[in-house]
From Swiss-Prot:
Catalysed reactions listed for this entry: 7-aminomethyl-7-carbaguanine + guanosine(34) in tRNA = 7-aminomethyl-7-carbaguanosine(34) in tRNA + guanine
Species for this entry: Chlamydia caviae (strain ATCC VR-813 / DSM 19441 / 03DC25 / GPIC) (Chlamydophila caviae)
GO BP annotation list: queuosine biosynthetic process; tRNA-guanine transglycosylation
Entry cofactors: Zn(2+)
Entry keyword set: Glycosyltransferase, Metal-binding, Queuosine biosynthesis, Transferase, tRNA processing, Zinc
Residue segments, region RNA binding: 262-268, 286-290
E.C. designation(s): 2.4.2.29
Name of the gene: tgt
Matching Pfam families: TGT
Function as written in the Swiss-Prot or TrEMBL entry: Catalyzes the base-exchange of a guanine (G) residue with the queuine precursor 7-aminomethyl-7-deazaguanine (PreQ1) at position 34 (anticodon wobble position) in tRNAs with GU(N) anticodons (tRNA-Asp, -Asn, -His and -Tyr). Catalysis occurs through a double-displacement mechanism. The nucleophile active site attacks the C1' of nucleotide 34 to detach the guanine base from the RNA, forming a covalent enzyme-RNA intermediate. The proton acceptor active site deprotonates the incoming PreQ1, allowing a nucleophilic attack on the C1' of the ribose to form the product.
Binding-site positions, Zn(2+): 319, 321, 324, 351
Name of the protein in its database record: Queuine tRNA-ribosyltransferase
Entry-linked InterPro entries: TGT (IPR004803), TGT-like_sf (IPR036511), tRNA_ribo_trans-like (IPR002616)
Lineage: Bacteria, Pseudomonadati, Chlamydiota, Chlamydiia, Chlamydiales
Length: 372
């Protein structure tokens, strides 16, 4: 079945809302944080049954083991042994972010310079690129991308789009926006021929140009997408991103869920949930965990600091995750990181993912109380 979206409460204070998305593999309470399982796995976490929605990258799964191989095994849900919703991207995000840097990197001023050799050619038909594994030449078109996502069988899929960095010149930027919407229309047409249980979100581009964002919103509104996704360049920092998200959500109808692509750090979530964002995806909590940054109700903890060398308290006294209830102390976790014990990243990742789910639960409660 295609997804069904229900708004349970609209805040009286902002555009924030509490809702639920029904899919063939389960219900997602919104606003929701969506962790990224790049290769079909959450790094450092074995049990993902308590994660309502996971984001898997089509590009990586296309390169290995191959989406046709996964289809032959019954799809991504069976391959991963997951009986809960999955969202996949088009593959375009990974191709272009490997070349230019991701949206999140750009916001943190770490975007790569244009000219990476991973992209060989971009034209109206699609994009030719080199495999990051062996340099093999690959081609991705709207139809190839959607078929790959059909093979994977994700509940929510994304049409092919072109991700440009902030520093693109205006002429190429405008031609890219036009090409993206042609690609999205082709993606949607291909999807509608065989929708199965899947739903497709339309991606809104336009950079930081309000008029181009309005055009993008009009495009997705005029086509039967099941939800909206805000993509493309969102500026160089949070201050530039906020007006982009604000103007974009102001143009969108309220009957479909809105996802913010590639953004899911805590400051961004707190800043944009009131603008009407229903879901966020990011590898932030697991990546932070692998680098020894622990999220907690008392603020972030850099576990390598000497201050925690003899600290036998739990990572977060308010937390009920498997790490904290197993009495893994700050001192012990610091020791594991210092000796490069793999368990360190596992314990930290379990905690950070649980913490993010609790943050979203608290946000939903605040919206219900019209506090956001």
């Amino acid at each position: 079945m295609a997804l069904k979206f229900h708004v349970l409460h609209q805040s009286k204070k902002s555009r924030a809302r509490v809702g639920k998305i029904e899919t063939a593999h389960g219900i997602i309470d919104t606003p929701a944080f969506v962790p990224v399982a790049t290769n079909g796995a959450l790094k450092g976490v074995i049990d993902h049954s308590n994660i309502p929605l996971m984001f898997c990258n089509t590009y990586h799964l296309l390169v290995h083991p191959g989406t046709e191989a996964i289809a032959a095994m019954g799809g991504l849900h069976k391959f991963m042994n997951r009986n809960a919703p999955i969202i996949t991207d088009s593959g375009g995000f990974q191709i272009f972010s490997l070349a230019y840097g991701s949206v999140a990197e750009e916001i943190k001023s770490r975007g790569k310079k244009k000219g990476s050799s991973s992209i060989l050619e971009v034209n109206d038909e699609g994009v030719w690129f080199k495999s990051y594994r062996d340099g093999h030449k690959l081609f991705l078109s709207p139809e190839v991308s959607v078929q790959a996502q059909k093979d994977l069988g994700a509940d929510i899929i994304i049409p092919l789009d072109e991700l440009l960095p902030f520093h693109s010149d205006e002429k190429y930027f405008l031609s890219s926006c036009s090409r993206t919407y042609v690609w999205e229309k082709r993606s949607l047409d291909y999807h509608k021929k065989d929708p199965r249980h899947q739903s497709m979100y339309g991606v809104i581009h336009g950079g930081i140009d309000p008029e181009q964002r309005k055009i993008g919103c009009q495009f997705v509104e005029d086509h039967p997408f099941d939800g909206f996704a805000i993509g493309g360049s969102l500026g160089r920092n949070l201050q530039e991103m906020l007006p982009v998200v604000d103007v974009t959500t102001s143009y969108l109808s309220k009957d479909r869920p809105v996802h913010l692509l590639g953004i899911g750090d805590l400051p961004s979530i707190h800043a944009t949930v009131g603008l009407g964002i229903d879901s966020f995806d990011s590898s932030y909590p697991t990546k932070a965990a692998r680098h020894g940054l622990i999220l907690s109700s008392q603020g972030p903890i850099k576990i390598a600091n000497q201050a925690y060398a003899n600290d036998l308290s739990s990572l977060d006294p308010e937390c009920t995750c498997a790490t904290c209830t197993s009495n893994i102390s700050r001192a012990y976790l610091r020791h594991l990181f210092k000796v490069h014990e793999p368990n360190a990243a596992i314990w930290a990742s379990i905690h950070n993912l649980h913490y993010m789910q609790e943050v979203m639960k608290n946000i939903r409660e605040q919206i219900l109380n019209d506090e956001i």
